[in-house]
Amino acid sequence: MTDAPLPSLTDLRKEIDAIDADMHALLMRRGRVIDTLIEIKKRQGGGSAFRPLREAQMMRAIAERHRGVLPLDTVEGIWRIIISTFTYVQAPHSVHVDVARGDAPMRDSARFHFGYTVPCVSHHGVAGVIGGVANGANDLGMLALDAGPGAGAWWRALEPPDAPKIIARLPFVERPDHPAGLPVFVIAKPLADGAARDEIIESVRLDRWRDAYPAALLAIGAEIIGNAGAETGLALLVSRPSACALDALRAALLGAGARDVRMAEVGAHAARFDGSQLRPNG
C-alpha cells in the first residue's frame, strides 16, 4: 500500500491564504458583534467596557487549550491585542504607565497586554499614573508591583472610596519565560460590575515591622506585597484570598504582635494562574 501523495506547495499556500481570509472575516464579524454590544449598552444606560474577570478567564482558557508549533507567547499576544483593541473601541481610553524604574520593561509590558492602538502615556512616578487615571474618563494605569523605594506607600492614595482601585494583576498566565513577565497591577476608577475578586488587596497601617508578619499571613493564605514607612508607623500592601475574611487578617497580624491595625481595601483581582506546567506542544 503506497502512501498518499503530499500536497504541492502551491496547494498549501492556497490553504494558508484561505485560512488567513477566514481569520480576517471572523475578526470583522467580531467587530459587528461589538457594534451591537455598544448599542445595547447605550440603551441600557451604559456600563464599563472593562471586564477583568472575563479577560482572565478567556486568557486561561486559551492557554489551556493551545496546542501545536505556534508559541503560546504569540497566541497570548494576539489575543491580548484583540481583547484590548475591542475594549478601546467600546470605550476610548489611555493607559498611564510608571516608567520611573526603566522605560523598556514597562513599555514592553504595556504593549504586550494592551497593543498599539490604545495610547500609552508615560509618567515618572506612581503619583502621575494614579492622577492620570483619576482625571481620565475611562483610563487605566499600570504599576510595577515593585515600584521601587522612592515610591513609598503609594497604595495609600487608593484608599479613598472614589479613588482608582487595583482591578487586575498581569500577566494573566504566569510562567518563567513570559515575554512580558514583569508583575504589574492595573488600576482603574472603581468598577460597577465585571470585577474579579478572587484576591483582595488591602492597605494596612500598623505600628511597626515585625519578622513574624510574613509567616503569620502565609498561614491564612495571605501575602505581603509591599511595605514602606508611614508618618505614624508602617504601611503594608497585603493580598488575601476572598475566602480569608478581613477579621482573620486582622487577627493574624495582632497575633504576630501588631498594634493599631487599620485596613482599607484598595482593589481586587483574579486568582493568579501558573502556566509553567502547560504543554502547548503536547
What positions do the PLM features span?
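Domain-level signature for soluble enzymes in the chorismate/prephenate branch of the shikimate pathway
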Residues: 1-282
